[in-house]
Amino acid sequence: MKRAILLAGLITATTAQAEILPDALQDIKAVQFNSANVITAGLPSEAQFGKLQQAGVDLVINLIPDGNSSGHEDEASLVKAAGMTYESISVDWKKPNIEDVERFFSIMNANRDKDILVHCAANYRASAFYYLYQATQLKQDSKQQKLQTLAPWGDLESSLKEYPQWQVLMEQVKAKYQ
């Protein structure tokens, strides 16, 4: 009996999710602390990947398109060298699509036990994808939640008028999943 309790405790301890420690991450571009285990941000500097790992991040999801000048040349190597797992989804700013969102959902759902950074160049793509994840997968879709998660966009109504492709994407994804 004692062994069973000890074994259960060890299993729980090794699979328990830690929280991201935000104090060391305040200087990351457009960082947004969405929950204890998920943050969104603009592009971290090369040096900040080590800070992210030390703060508890396990997985980095990059939404900057491959070959885009606003990204790092070999971000996968930077992330892996810092001891984290790396995923990339090449999201076209001008033509975001539901397939990319669904791939994002798959990655997020497969890594619910991880502490995650989702980033792009300025935290527009990242916050939009995470908002859609919250709204459709976690069923957290209040007006307050939307405004908080999409805070990097500034005046949301004006921003979505300026970038209508993102309004269309949000409507399509929500219609499909709700």
Regions found by a protein language model. Give the residues of each.
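Sec-dependent N-terminal signal peptides
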Residues: 4-13
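Cys-dependent protein tyrosine phosphatase-like superfamily
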Residues: 17-116, 129-178
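Short, surface-exposed ligand- or partner-binding patches at beta-edge/loop junctions that are enriched
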Residues: 119
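Substrate/cofactor-recognition hotspot
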Residues: 123
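Short active-site segment of divalent metal-dependent hydrolases/proteases
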Residues: 126
